[in-house]
Amino acid sequence: MKLSEKIINTILLGILSLTIHVSFAYSAEITLDLSYYNYEEPNFMSDTSDPAFISLGVKNWDLPKNSDSVWNFLYTTELSKGWVSYSGSGTLDKDYYKLRGETYLGYKIEDFISIIGMGYRWLYDDSGGSVSSTGALGYDRKNQLFYVPVGGILDLTDKLRIKGQYNYLILGTQTSYLSDVAGFTDVTNEQRFGWGTDFTLDYKIDNKTSVYSFARYWDIANSDTATGTFAGVLLFQAFEPANTTAEVGIGISYNF
């Protein structure tokens, strides 16, 4: 892990821990959702959910009801498991694991809360030890994205709310565990350019229960080039191709 990634990771986890601790004193929601997922590297490969991703999380998007302050810390956390079908060098079924955490500083103006914060997404592709339909050997992959979410939360009615944000990529790292294939060394690439969007529509059934739908998207440019070795001697260079990720899902939340 490079120094820049360590610094960002430490700051983000510290802010997120403090935010969750403070926010639990006011209110929080448990979330459960199912989603469609598609990751694509054009002309190279694609990973598509088969059948779906399932996610469990905790969030707080509300300001304290009895507070006179227009400022507050809000957050979203989520852990996901996905069953994925790979298409590229043949076909392959595998598992995905995903962790997403975002913390925001919110400012309320009537029915609108503007937000800006820090976000982190960790994604693990568990392909090591697998063999595709054409005999290609699989290897594990880990992706980390550090980003700044900017957007807002608007209460359209007492029951209907929409949240939208633009995600500005600060740093991405892609680790390919090529050592899963005998003779190769692992390779880590940095991703410097990219952006994403995230929209959620939330409908309150009663004071405790809500249903929601969401759509998320990432567009990441080519990474830098890193050097690896084979059999301890032969050098090779590798980069992570430009890629897109799309997610669409529905869920239910409970306020406690």
Question: Where are the regions that the model predicts?
Answer:
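Predominantly the C-terminal beta-signal and adjacent terminal strand-loop region
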Residues: 186-256
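Short glycine/proline- and aromatic-enriched beta-strand/turn motifs that initiate or cap beta-hairpins
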Residues: 25-89, 253-255
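Residues that define the transmembrane beta-barrel architecture of outer-membrane proteins
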Residues: 48-56, 71, 81, 93-101, ...
